Amino acid sequence: MITFSDIRIIKPFIKRSNNHTARLTFYTRILLLFILVVSKALAQQSVIKYVQPFSGTSASTTLASQHVEDKTERLANTIPAVAPPFSMTQWTPQTQLSEKKCLAPYYYNNKKFYGIRASHWISGSCTQDYGSFTIMPIAGKLKTNPTDYAVDYTHQEEVATPAYYKTDLPGYNLRTEATATLRCGLIKITALKADSVYLLITPNSDQGKGYIKIDRQKGEISGYNPVHRIYQGWGQPAGFSGYFFIRIKKGFTRSGVFSGGNVSAHQSIENQIDLGAYLGFKLQKGETISIYAGTSFTSIAAAKLNLETELNSANLETIVAKTSRVWEQSLGQVEVKDPNEKNKRIFYTALYHAQQHPRLFNDVDGGYPQFAGNYTKKVLKKDNYYDDFSMWDTYRAQLPLVELLKPNLANDFANSLILKGQQGGWLPIFPCWNNYTAAMIGDHATAFLASAYNKGIRGYDVKEAYRLMRQNAFQMPDSADYLNGKGRRGINSYLKYGYIPMEDSIPDAYHKREQVSRTLEYAYDDYALATVAKDLGKTSDYKQLTERASNYKNVFDQQVGMARGRFADGSWYKPFYPDHREPYITEGTPRQYTFYVPHDVPGLIKLMGGKKNLENELDSLFAKKEYWHGNEPGHQIPFLYNYTYSPWKTQLQVSRILAEEYDEGAGGLSGNDDAGQMSAWYVFAAMGFYPADPVSGNYQLTSPLFTQTVISFNNGKKLTITAIKKTKKSIYSSKITLNGKSFTKNQITHKLLLQGGELIFYLQDQPGMP
């Protein structure tokens, strides 16, 4: 039986005559059979059908978007990525040509299609793509200028799942389909009418670098795109390239290379602006071209090995089904039951976005580029190596979600960070492009490693991890290393004063100044390391780090009741504007950052003069619409009400945020998704708990969004979270039970969650006793 879902998926494949009567061509019937097989497989699956890959690909249309402080933050900057979770390369339709900073490869509202890109874009970020290449099919005459070959497309012709993408290009009468494995992509081009067809293959180097070569006899194309990293606002060579090896399953009649509009019959080209290769075919209606592409960060030979290992000669249908099963298993670790289908779509889309990064970086044989290694190759003996840790964002919820659901993967992440520290000499702060970056603030690789350690995730060299974390916390790199992005920014000032004074402008960083935010976040990282030091019996370190964890108090001005810039002599920065963007605050205001003391909320309460004052300050923040969910430093703020006399306000604000900051459709996210952090917040909050202080292993409770949520843990246990609501509007908890016994705390431990069982929330329409 063909379901409504089937019709929705196959609609773009149905041709209509002038009188709008549907009629299927012979070819379309054949294609329809495949689409029905795929759609039936999806229909039988329980969760992948809810994922909306286009969510976050246009400016936010959520209810809260009108209050966003920085309009550039209205772009979530996700892409409709086709690939398994945490893969090396994501395959995406391309509507933007460049690898420029903050420019995603795909935006929903763009009208022109430029091909399928093998992308290393950090999902939801404001960084840049790197080592990418694009495959563009065209028909008719050969055109090599992007402005000439770009073609109109419509969303009515698009189909997207985590495992499959399809669009028709009416201007060329071509259909483009794509699927992927961890390191490889398979693209299928179908002629909808007889014509000359060309494939354009372009390394996307903005620096006019790169290489591409055609082997006509073997039907193979290979090349590379050298990677550039952002460092202090400009690009530098990253010391490795994005390599590709492509095999075409159809003979081509013509081939050559080009640089912009300059076309040549040569079979290779190197280091030219807008370079690429073209392949020509004569296709009859219904004929196809299958393009098998392997990728690597070490060599063309490795890209070929990855291709032959993962794809070989498999057909599109097989890979779509295989990758769909991988996603089904991964997403299916959390099963939600609820009559609200819209919320399920938002939830599973969030869970999909939260499983894009960190990025797999090694080949099938274990080869990977040495961290900051200038084209040096290393080989793993076991496990996998990962990079692109958007650490300032993801230590808060995205990485804790991995710790909760996939602890073995968290071990790989920890081992990868340790390898980086060993190879580069210092534990990196924000490792992207397999390099030091001096981007963002804090030292949150330490926070992640401590969080994993405290949750019993210890499949790595703990002593070496501690050595590297301690080095960051207690030592200053030499001048050359510091300039290269190693070590904590402003560490000497921080150690001398117990805060970073306004006189230290932090010149050697992408984000300069921001002294108060750095102080607050270093205090948290010191606390994180202190927890590990205590467990390892490092008594002296524990004592010093515990004292330093209170450094947040040194930038809290009790006269104004908020965090504030401070000079070396102890005086305060003037004037003071609590709700303005200030140079000593990172991407926010003093009012917003004042609440960043996740490790010592009782200490913050004391500074503020009691629980009631904390509650009043929180009330004021929300009443002024100063809470900025689109930026990470405030993600723990709604849960601070759990420390006041009115924990029901956590339930109120979290329920409001779930409804106002997230939605369906291309504009469904209210800010940069930042490698899945925004999405991970939704996943946790919808389940009914959140790691406001991930290092502690405690989760703050709130009211669950769904009637029932079942979490399957790696240890074989299951936790069922049930919300028993008096009405559809019930969001306030009157009682909680765990395995039939009353549970009266506002937080729950990681260890207790992993024991499984049933957590029941009894919800009502008003706060207070039932």
What is each residue range found by the language model?
Residues M1-Q45:
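Bacterial Sec-dependent N-terminal signal peptides
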Residues Q44-A447, Y453-L520, A533-N554, V560, ...:
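Accessory carbohydrate-recognition regions in carbohydrate-active enzymes
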